[in-house]
């Protein structure tokens, strides 16, 4: 293991097998916090490679807590985080809206590490991140959506969280997070914090045999955006295509990114709730509609403009907030039942 660490410290790449060995040592608690931090920083400085990423993904997937995988078609929508944009939480809000549009969603996420707020920071306030795998699956069967809190399925992620929080930078674990959903979805929409990650991530999704996957980056954020062209890498039937989308492709207006900024977790939550209730700012609702539109493409709905309008219609009537309330009520009811046993 020291040889692998020395290679990293010298600014050199490690191969897939070495990456697997490194992750295995981290999982088995054979490395100190300083060694882990040093390895992560070494990769971050020169840029994580395809082999380093796939090696980490392979090992982590073999150590996931089992999840009762549905037989039906379902998707994840997630991002690497780490873009330091401090925008509203787009992927979580989009997941809820997409579910009201008929998409089946199993969203995998984490607490904030290097960003202002993570998907699970928002959902924690609605008691939605501590579901057992069985309860999460029940929510999926009944409501068409559920949320999987990454550290519940990967104990190593819980152990290294303090290290990542102290580093306050995106690392290898930001990159692999969207690739290790324990439900192993056949469809996924992934945002990456830098354009250079589009190619390695879509190639890894190809190796993992996803049916249909889209990876996006837009002007510094790991989402579909309306402030700048969105760069796309799409995998469908084992074929990869690259292209660019703009706001007009969704039938939406452009907005400056500054309108999406938020400056506290409280504000992030308020923005999300307002969007779901149909009371959000037009720019907020529009960017959610764009992300939902592309997500629906994974399910075969190829008209992005029609998809965006469907999302805006659901938002206008507050239907996504009703779904969020149903998820919260389900959690509370199950908690009460558990306590009376």
Swiss-Prot record:
Alphabetically, the GO molecular function entries are: anthranilate phosphoribosyltransferase activity; magnesium ion binding
Q: Which residues bind Mg(2+) 1?
A: 91, 223
- Cofactor note text: Binds 2 magnesium ions per monomer.
List ligand-binding residues for 5-phospho-alpha-D-ribose 1-diphosphate: 79, 82-83, 87, 89-92, 107-115, 119
Q: Please give the positions of the paired cysteines in each disulfide bond.
A: none
Can you state which reaction this protein catalyses? N-(5-phospho-beta-D-ribosyl)anthranilate + diphosphate = 5-phospho-alpha-D-ribose 1-diphosphate + anthranilate
InterPro entries annotated for this entry?
Anthranilate_Pribosyl_Tfrase, Glycosyl_Trfase_fam3, Glycosyl_Trfase_fam3_N_dom, Glycosyl_Trfase_fam3_N_dom_sf, Nuc_phospho_transferase
Binding residues annotated for anthranilate 2, in chain numbering: 164
Q: Which Pfam families match?
A: Glycos_trans_3N (PF02885), Glycos_transf_3 (PF00591)
Q: Give its E.C. classification number.
A: 2.4.2.18
One GO location term (cellular component): cytosol
Describe the family membership recorded for this protein in Swiss-Prot or TrEMBL: Belongs to the anthranilate phosphoribosyltransferase family.
The function of this protein is: Catalyzes the transfer of the phosphoribosyl group of 5-phosphorylribose-1-pyrophosphate (PRPP) to anthranilate to yield N-(5'-phosphoribosyl)-anthranilate (PRA).
The cross-references to PANTHER family, in alphabetical order and at most eight, read: ANTHRANILATE PHOSPHORIBOSYLTRANSFERASE
- Subunit field text: Homodimer.
Task: Spell out the NCBIfam families in the cross-references.
Answer: trpD
The protein's name is Anthranilate phosphoribosyltransferase
Q: Which gene encodes it?
A: trpD
